């Protein structure tokens, strides 16, 4: 798969600072997602599961791409900034997976322990699962 070189990202003048972008992104409203999705549970090696919503693009790119979106600290996969990103990527032909960290969102109750967004191995397991399926 040939990738294009990344284009520089220039934030708008009214949101130059990363912290301000975070605050604005979480406060800016977004309508509910009405796109169809498939619910997926990814089993983890320790017996826990991550719950994922898979949004297939109606007009996928010639070489399919899956974008995996992980929510921020204390959030879930139905936050406004996630909904906006799903819509934008889906319109551009990208399949999107929104992943809830252990015990968050629709995955609440699946983790044996308490909420933990810092389990880096979980990201690797999601990427490995996406490659296999």
Q: What are the roles of these predicted feature ranges?
A:
Residues 74-76:
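Short strand->helix junction
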Residues 46-48, 78, 116-120:
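Phosphate/oxyanion-binding active-site loops and adjacent basic polyanion-contact surfaces
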Residues 1-28:
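N-terminal presequences and immediately downstream first alpha-helices
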Residues 88, 104-133:
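Catalytic nucleophile-loop/oxyanion-hole region of alpha/beta-hydrolase
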